[in-house]
Amino acid sequence: NAIPLNGFETVQPIYQFIKYLLKNEKDLQIDSEHMMVISPDEGGMGRAVFFANVLGLDLGMFYKRRDYTRIVNGRNPIVAHEFLGSSVEGKDVIIVDDMISSGESMLDTAKELKRRKARKVFICTTFGLFTNGLSKFDEYYENGIIDRVLTTNLVYQTPELLSKPYYIDVDMSKYIALIIDNLNHDSSLSDLLNPTKRINRLLEKYRAGER
């Protein structure tokens, strides 16, 4: 009962993340000397590699060292986040992941990056659930550990979340509508699924001072 894989497409909202980040942040230098992409764990490396390649940035990764002798809340607890990559000192970092559940792992990653003297920390995830509430994110923002949190509107966003000064709502409505329209007209999805050209145009406008 194997499901054929060739009928599935991976849709990455990278263009939308960059678009909304640049819209809300001025004077970012998007090059390998001033910015890095970070994967919070080994499972998200494919996503982060794509993100880094499209933007022409260096990549760093954390792996979770776990205590396999104990189980806490149904999981082996994380003992430490070990970092693999070049120095983040003085650089802006973009942490890329698919989901924020409780956010504990993401915040631990941000804290470790700040300990390593990263400049600004931006968190980009497709689905933001925030199952443990927003108090920890508030605390980390107030303490200067995180600067922005970007999640899409593909899941419900509470009014409380939308009101946070650090939160950026990444609207996917137009992109999803274009995908549906192309499918209904049997058109190619290639240009929609590969955002490189659109991102390059966006970066050119940003660097030229256009918003």
Question: Which residues make up each language-model segment?
Answer:
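PRPP-associated nucleotide enzymes
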Residues: 1-211
